[in-house]
Amino acid sequence: MQLKGKTAIVTGGASGLGEASVRLYVENGARVAIFDMNDDRGGKLAEELGEAVIYRNVNVTDEAAVATAIEATVKSFGDIHICNNFAGIGSAAKTVGKGKAMPLADFKQVIDINLIGTFNVLRLVAQQMASQDPIDEDGQRGVIINTASIAAYEGQIGQAAYSASKGGVVGMTLPIARDLASLGIRVNT
């Protein structure tokens, strides 16, 4: 897919890999919607990169917030062609550390953001992509890229929640790719 003139959504786009991707997309002529919760960094990045970028404060686990941000992206830029799911957190805690069990709420929060948040965004973006006309003669409508980690396969001490979340991302990507292939939407990690 040529990036020039395409629109990308980048979750976690205000820093790290997400920010690097935002910059690369803009350098190659794409328009970008940053979905993040860091208003300061996201807003400054959008301002720095100009009219080709918008920032939306989005909690990826919030269905209504994601849907509203997708609508705003379509209103600003038209069809959505790319979605990079970078939003995520880590929680370094042993299953039992210093005689106490890891708080279940910490485990759930990592799963909620890294796994369920990724699924929430990709399913709503896929719905939007499926409603769009194909961009080429092969029927391609878009691509969704999920961010996993070697921790999905080789987690270390204190990475149970993070490893489980990234293992879930790896595990769901292939069946989702098969689900969406007939709609012209590619899904990769």
Question: Whereabouts are the PLM-identified features?
Answer:
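Canonical Rossmann dinucleotide-binding motif of NAD(H)/NADP(H)-dependent dehydrogenases/reductases
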Residues: 3-32
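Residue(s) in the substrate-gating loop at a strand-loop-helix junction
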Residues: 149
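The beta1-alpha1 cofactor-binding region of Rossmann-like NAD(H)/NADP(H)-dependent oxidoreductases
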Residues: 39-40, 57-69, 104
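Conserved Rossmann-fold SDR core element
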Residues: 25, 79-82, 170, 180-189
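Conserved mid-core segment of classical short-chain dehydrogenase/reductases
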Residues: 90-108, 127, 131-138, 158-161
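Catalytic Tyr-X3-Lys loop
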Residues: 81, 89, 100-120, 145, ...
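Active-site helix of classical SDR
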Residues: 122, 165, 173
